Amino acid sequence: MTLQFDDLRQRGDRCLNFAAYSPRRLVLIHTAVSLGASLVVGLLNLLFSQMIANTGGLGGLTTRSMLETAQAVLELAVTLALPFWNISLSRAALCWARGELAEPPTLLEGFRRFRSVLGVKLLTGFIFLGLCMAVSYIGSMLFLFTPFAGGLIEAMDPIMQNSGVLDPELLLSDEVMAQISSAAVPLMIFLAVLFAALAIPVWYRIRFADFAVMDGGRAAVSLLESFRITKKKAWEVFKIDLRFWWFYLLQLLTVVLCYGDTILAALGVQLPISPDVSYVLFYAAGIVAQGLLLWWYQARVSVTYALAYETLTADETVLNAQ
């Protein structure tokens, strides 16, 4: 069966309308925890940075170390916990798509399936890490045979000794490193394009691994299931993404808003307020904007993809039965 966006959206709206527990309320709880944790971490980082800056001298070395350790541990804890919290929304979306009850305890499903979710995340990371390493090595070799490699070869030539080993003295020269960095831009572009050309198709083949693991599958099985159901269907999933272009664009703009103070500073724009106040205002504004966006639209987007997963899974079941 072909994935028809309009049909998925209409079915999704019906699923949300008949949900026993308000999907927007559930998304609000999910978003409040996610963004609230990010906001708290951001504010605590600012506080810790100020405390570290105000602690000088050898006498404050122990205090600075403790503050830096607390800052690192806090960031690590939130970074590790959020993926398990965020993936739980996929379980809620599956419940909406199937007419099942999704309520606040559903948002803990990612933690209940800790091992499987962790396995999916690690395997996904290994897939793209391996792909990145392969592209870096093979792509660099291929780049040397292109006409764009001439500038980089010329920039590297002065620092190569007769034995083909880099001269460490010249490597310390700022002028030489600036020339190499400038000449390496075509290589970076080439590798980025090559990586995107390989990674995007792979990403769309494992796009539904989160739904599969929330549907009860184990880590490797969930990835294989996603590969199986998206066979010859990745383009249709991509077209669904294109129909949600406005949602992803608004998400990007909210992220840009969070770093508005940094962007304005890079553009040379100075605000008539202190940098710390500017950081807090922009970061809080971005968090609020993102929260409103997710509260209003996240349920409709999530249930659309959940219904796409259900459709693809049903199609594979029919094919296997035949």
Residue map of PLM features:
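Short hydrophobic membrane-inserting alpha-helices and related fusion/pore-forming segments
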Residues: 254-258
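Interfacial aromatic "cap" segments that immediately flank transmembrane helices
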Residues: 2-37, 104-134, 181-192, 200-253, ...
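Compositionally biased amphipathic helical and low-complexity segments enriched in hydrophobic
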Residues: 59, 108-109, 272, 320
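Low-complexity, intrinsically disordered extramembrane tails and loops of integral membrane proteins
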Residues: 1-14, 162-175, 313-322
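Juxtamembrane "helix-exit" motif on the non-cytosolic side of transmembrane helices
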Residues: 47-52, 262-268
